[in-house]
Amino acid sequence: MKSISPAEAARWLVHCQAYDPSGIKTGAVGDPRVKGGRGYPIGVGSLGALGGVHLEGATLRETLLLNLVPVAPGWQNGDDRDLPVWEREPQTASEESDGTRGPYGLLSLYTWQSRRVRLFGNAGDITGAMIAIGDRLDWQDRHLLEPMSVWGRSGPRERDQKRTPIYLPRPHDHSRALWRGLQTLLPAPPPPGADPPQRLSPMVVQWLARLTVTGVVGSDFRVRPRATSVTYGTQQAVVDEVFSDALTMNVLLLVEHSALRTAAVDAAADAENAVKVLRRLADNLSRAAGSRDIDSGDADRAAEQAYAELDRGFRDWLAHLGPGSDPVAERTAWQRLVRRTTLRLGYELVSATGPAAWIGRAGVDRNGREVHYSSSQAEAWFRNGLAKALPMASETSQQRQEEPA
């Protein structure tokens, strides 16, 4: 490829300012930070540290409106210095001083220049680019300004600065689906006592919840929060992984005291608890077969398969919830689905064990007690564990007849 169109170059320019990896860059003429023709790392692009969340509507217009949030009490009379970069005096190669850099509001934040970029070419073709270091952006306590990120308290900074709370953006956990961390996405009731919350949901979510409570948005409205973040590799100089996931849900789930919200968060926890029981079954079967390596990977594989099979079920169940739903009945139905899935996977694990596991062997459990590990004993523990993890999925005689032998 020798060139790209100006339109495509503009898209890559936005991407570069947002997610460019750290590392050594070309030194820009006139930048006092340059040494030996090189600009040394100042961190990733402006959005690289965020656990980004935006709301997807049915149309582009709806999506734009859902994500335009009045982020401060005095938003009607914003700071006069809050301007997009193209309405300010042209920047030089040097980093702006702390006193004038900002950001002063959403306009300057959304057009933050993490890099100094020069495109080469003409009106019809872009043939090259030079990327140099730009302005650092300290995200500490920007949760009242940046509306599209998950935030969490920073223990190390609170200890260093001897004050609380201090919030930093929290990238998403790329190792698990968004629904498994649903409680971090949805606004939560204030914690008991005077302690500030450990996590803050994105302001776009809080704002839509407020519009729902005040009746601006109807209780039958459905929205699709999409989470996006980037994982960087060695010294943040390379992109390791890009995460993107979305969930369709009714707006009542965004309201902090909503019974539907509680049911959804508890349902995600139900799945986690059931999979923990399945993991223990896999570990106990390994012990029964004579394995002394409790980290053999059997438990991880069993958990991975369980989450894969529960994934579509939870997404469909969540999207089904609405103002006419009975939270208790819906959660009961979910627990029964989880029970059926984990029971089947558990029986498959038991059936796959050989004669050595049927006979079993003596061992010591997690509490230091001597026990006899066998496939039959592991299955009994498994069924008992599921009964405790999923108490609403009560076992009936009909269910027992339908379960695999």
Question: What do these predicted ranges mean?
Answer:
Residues 2-4, 116:
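The −1 position to Zn-ligating cysteines in a subset of zinc-ribbon hairpins
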Residues 5-8, 120:
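Short Cys/His-rich metal-coordination motifs, predominantly Zn2+-binding knuckles/fingers
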Residues 10-13:
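Short functional micro-motifs and their immediate structural scaffolds
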Residues 15-405:
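Extended alpha-helical scaffolding segments
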